[in-house]
């Protein structure tokens, strides 16, 4: 089965998280889970982060943007990753954790 463009982005993101030794998971949505939660949530060297993966020109929904803002307001790092910046996840985490 062929991967969707977003699945390809997620695969690259997850590999970088593994490479740096970050703790991460994919939140459950629907049912008891919440909607609008970023695709990948985790912690790296004490830094809470949340990543929304998108492909092409896709943008976060208003609810996703709201959740990302709540995370940022609480002191977490959150950003949107796509094909253009998907290879910079490890670098971004290292820089933020050492700031």
Predicted regions and their residues:
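Catalytic phosphate/metal-binding cores of nucleic-acid and nucleotide-processing enzymes, i.e., regions
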Residues: 1-99
């Amino acid at each position: 089965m062929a991967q969707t463009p977003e699945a390809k982005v997620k695969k690259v993101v997850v590999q970088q998280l593994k490479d740096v030794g970050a703790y991460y998971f994919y939140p459950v949505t629907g049912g008891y889970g919440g909607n609008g939660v970023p695709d990948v949530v985790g912690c790296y060297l004490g830094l809470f982060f949340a990543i929304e993966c998108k492909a092409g020109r896709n943008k976060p929904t208003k609810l996703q943007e709201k959740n990302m803002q709540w995370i940022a307001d609480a002191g977490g790092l959150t950003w949107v990753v796509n094909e253009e910046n998907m290879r910079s996840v490890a670098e971004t985490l290292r820089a933020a954790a050492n700031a």
